[in-house]
């Protein structure tokens, strides 16, 4: 008697609302797309997109990175986003604009950049 195998289709999750965490530092930009619980759906960074050195923290690199994440999010079924921005880098606004241009609806833009209440002493100024 032959055994028959049945293959089940993988359960492809279809999300509607997601969160885009944009971490923009002076050296790089990292964008992570999560669902409401915080499980990672997709991520990308300027270094992953092929930018090297000081080109990683440019608005253009942020735009390309955000477009890559938005494409993956649209494939996962995300239509609406909450954007959480962290850090002082140059590509923050360009990344948000790129997400809007990919026909994603932004619900909230929240800035959670950590600001010290006179915490540690900063490093000395560079003399060039």
From Swiss-Prot:
InterPro entries: Ribosomal_uS11, Ribosomal_uS11_bac-type, Ribosomal_uS11_sf
Pfam families per UniProt: Ribosomal_S11 (PF00411)
Gene Ontology molecular function: rRNA binding; structural constituent of ribosome
GO cellular component, one term: ribosome
Keywords for the protein's UniProt record, in alphabetical order: Ribonucleoprotein, Ribosomal protein, RNA-binding, rRNA-binding
UniProt GO BP: translation
Domain of life of the organism encoding this protein: Bacteria
Keyword Nucleus part of the UniProt annotation: no
Family of the protein in this entry: Belongs to the universal ribosomal protein uS11 family.
Function: Located on the platform of the 30S subunit, it bridges several disparate RNA helices of the 16S rRNA. Forms part of the Shine-Dalgarno cleft in the 70S ribosome.
Quaternary structure and partners: Part of the 30S ribosomal subunit. Interacts with proteins S7 and S18. Binds to IF-3.
Name of the protein this chain belongs to: Small ribosomal subunit protein uS11
Gene this protein is translated from: rpsK
């Amino acid at each position: 008697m032959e055994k028959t195998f049945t293959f089940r289709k993988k359960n492809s999750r279809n999300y509607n609302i997601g969160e885009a965490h944009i971490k923009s530092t002076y050296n790089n930009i990292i964008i992570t797309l999560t669902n409401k619980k915080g499980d990672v759906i997709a991520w990308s960074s300027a270094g992953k997109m092929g930018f090297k050195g000081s080109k990683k923290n440019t608005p253009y690199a942020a735009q390309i990175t955000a477009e890559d994440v938005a494409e993956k999010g649209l494939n996962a079924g995300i239509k609406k986003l909450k954007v959480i921005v962290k850090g002082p880098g140059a590509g923050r606004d360009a990344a948000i604009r790129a997400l809007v241009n990919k026909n994603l609806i932004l619900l909230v833009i929240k800035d959670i950049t950590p600001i010290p209440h006179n915490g540690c002493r900063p490093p000395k100024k560079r003399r060039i």
